[in-house]
């Protein structure tokens, strides 16, 4: 009787395990299938969203964003007093383009999270407001991931976390994403400068004409930026001014005045596999469209202006050197979607970095969600 019971129990357990495996495989195939063919959905979403924005902007009812409400200082007075670009801090977002994952992926990751007792984090429910909604909430740093598509010389850049498995995005076509940001900027003249952080993908799956981001593609990417942003671009050339290098500019405490940067958009290139090649195009960075974001160990190089210090504890530790003495602009992260803590938030608020990124910004769509801010603000004076 006992042997029979054990045998029956083992059969039942095996049956449950096989059923779970079958469900996981179905969800995996379904997720990949939807993700692979989700491009048309992304394109349709973006086109309709842009048309909607244009219809809203060009009416008498649109009211520009009141970013003064989200600043802990008088912006007009700060501009009059000569506050510099590197003397303010702004709140940013991570994966700023992210839409809710497709249904089967949410089911798949949730199931895996349950099976592994939480060891595999459930990040499938992460999404953000649209880029425009974030800008309306006075978010002044956006971060997007770039994939390169090269169809026999027809080069495009798309915005996605994963071109197959996690392909839901609010701004699929990069040039149209810039159009959306520029459109908002047009209708919010004199806004606090926006930092657009670009993270290109060096390794990509060999599908959909995707290619690794190379220096040749970076040159094309610069052209897209200049074409889309025009005189809205806060360029390295403008920031350098009369100086031969960023190091010289920083040593003379000569970041441009905030008032001269209002209404502009600076594009930052996340440290990646082609950073050195991008710098080598012109080591002064004067002729490039993007500012290379380097690491703390690169702080004394002549072309260093922005650095990544994603750990807020390290940002606190190095603040006196990086922000106060060396006058670089520092970006750190307060959290990620699957991990946040009061301790980390306290560090992020106190670190003195110029750009603090969060996965939990103030939201227009779900305002009661958990949020992180800079002491209740998204724009802060560091002086």
Regions found by a protein language model. Name each.
Residues 12-17, 21-383:
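Catalytic cores of phosphodiester-bond hydrolases, prominently lipid phosphodiesterases
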Residues 1-9:
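N-terminal Lys/Arg-rich, disordered targeting/topogenic segments
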């Amino acid at each position: 009787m006992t042997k029979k019971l054990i045998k029956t129990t083992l059969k039942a357990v095996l049956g449950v395990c096989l059923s779970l495996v079958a469900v996981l495989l179905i969800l995996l195939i379904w997720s990949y299938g939807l993700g692979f063919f989700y491009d048309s959905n992304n394109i349709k979403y973006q086109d309709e969203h842009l048309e909607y924005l244009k219809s809203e902007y060009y009416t008498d009812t649109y009211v520009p964003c009141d970013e003064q409400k989200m600043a802990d200082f008088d912006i007009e007075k700060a501009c009059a007093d000569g506050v510099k670009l590197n003397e303010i801090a702004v709140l940013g977002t991570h994966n700023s383009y992210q839409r809710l994952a497709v249904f089967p992926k949410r089911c798949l990751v949730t199931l895996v999270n349950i099976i592994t007792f939480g060891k595999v984090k459930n990040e499938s429910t992460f999404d953000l407001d649209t880029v425009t909604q974030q800008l309306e909430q006075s978010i002044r740093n956006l971060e997007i991931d770039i994939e390169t598509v090269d169809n026999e010389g027809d080069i495009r850049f798309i915005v996605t976390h994963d071109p197959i498995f996690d392909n839901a995005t609010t701004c699929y076509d990069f040039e149209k994403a810039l159009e959306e940001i520029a459109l908002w900027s047009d209708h919010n003249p004199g806004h606090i400068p926006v930092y657009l952080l670009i993270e290109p993908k060096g390794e990509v799956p060999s599908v959909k004409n995707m290619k690794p981001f190379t220096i040749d593609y970076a040159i094309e990417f610069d052209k897209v930026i200049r074409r889309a942003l025009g005189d809205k671009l806060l360029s390295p050339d403008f920031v350098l001014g009369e100086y031969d290098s960023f190091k010289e500019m920083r040593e003379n405490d000569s970041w441009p005045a905030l008032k001269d940067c209002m209404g502009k958009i600076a594009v930052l290139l996340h440290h990646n596999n082609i950073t050195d090649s991008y710098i080598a195009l012109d080591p002064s960075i004067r002729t490039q469209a993007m500012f290379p974001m380097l690491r703390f160990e690169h702080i004394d190089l002549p072309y260093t202006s922005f650095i990544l210090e994603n750990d807020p504890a390290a940002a606190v530790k190095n603040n006196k050197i990086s922000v106060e003495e060396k006058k670089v602009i520092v970006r750190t992260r307060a959290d990620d979607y699957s991990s946040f803590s009061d301790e980390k938030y306290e560090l992020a608020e106190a670190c003195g970095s110029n750009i603090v990124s969060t996965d939990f910004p103030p939201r227009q769509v779900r305002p009661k969600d958990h949020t992180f801010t800079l002491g209740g603000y998204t724009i802060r004076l560091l002086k």
